[in-house]
């Protein structure tokens, strides 16, 4: 009999609760059925709201982006302060525990090592009749990464999104992450982005940030 074990974590305000579920042949159908109940069909009420945001960003660019940032993040962001400055990054380093910075650096080494093993390479094979077969692997010139914010910092999201792109050879990596009410980004997120090699960091969150990276605005 095939036996698999999965741990499901449930977070609760004021404390953490972890429920360990043993996934066996006898129990897996019931467990998987419960997981599959989280169907995309229930997302319909969000799709229309997101579609409206996408269209507004595509049509109105920065104006819509800054308005959404004000409404959702309560931050006054404009063309002059949307890009995280080197001074802000330096300040972030002064606020993050040096031990945590070392942990981030060790994680970078481990993650890079893993993705290096996944990397594909170009190859070509010439046949006697002149036919050339092969594979040409070319990295994207530019990649946009989105990192959540809100009530917590997610440095792991930075590393897991940025490092595969770096290993692949992407020339420029930009990152969007939401600001707090003061227009600042979590220090840990900034440190992780700097260590991972992000080229430009924008103070923008939500669907409006993803849309801005996809369609482009004057600032992004």
Regions found by a protein language model. Give the residues of each.
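Short, basic, glycine/proline-bearing loop/turn elements
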Residues: 31-33, 147, 195-200
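Conserved small-residue-rich beta-alpha loop and adjacent elements
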Residues: 125-191
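Short, Lys/Arg-enriched N-terminal segments with co-localized hydrophobic residues
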Residues: 1-17
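Predominant activation on well-ordered alpha-helical scaffold segments within soluble catalytic domains
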Residues: 51, 66, 108, 112, ...
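N-terminal Rossmann-like NAD(P)+-binding subdomain of aldehyde/semialdehyde dehydrogenases
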Residues: 17-141
């Amino acid at each position: 009999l095939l036996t698999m074990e999965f741990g499901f974590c449930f977070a609760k305000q004021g404390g953490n609760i972890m429920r360990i579920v043993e996934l066996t042949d006898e129990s897996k159908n019931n467990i998987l059925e419960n997981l599959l109940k989280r169907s995309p069909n229930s997302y319909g009420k969000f799709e229309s709201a997101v579609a409206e945001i996408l269209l507004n960003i595509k049509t109105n660019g920065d104006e819509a982006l800054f308005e959404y940032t004000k409404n959702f993040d309560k931050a006054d962001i404009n063309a002059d302060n949307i890009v995280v400055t080197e001074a802000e990054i330096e300040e972030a380093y002064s606020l993050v525990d040096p031990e945590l910075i070392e942990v981030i650096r060790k994680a970078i080494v481990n993650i890079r090592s893993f993705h290096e093993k996944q990397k594909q390479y170009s190859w070509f094979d010439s046949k006697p009749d002149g036919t050339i077969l092969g594979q040409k692997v070319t990295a994207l010139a530019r990649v946009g990464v989105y990192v959540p914010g809100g009530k917590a910092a997610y440095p792991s999201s930075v590393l897991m999104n940025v490092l595969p792109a770096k290993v692949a050879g992407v020339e420029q990596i930009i990152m969007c992450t939401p600001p707090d009410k003061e227009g600042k980004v979590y220090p840990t997120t900034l440190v992780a982005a700097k260590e991972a090699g992000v080229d430009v960091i924008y103070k923008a969150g939500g669907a409006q940030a993803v849309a801005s990276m996809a369609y482009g605005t004057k600032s992004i």
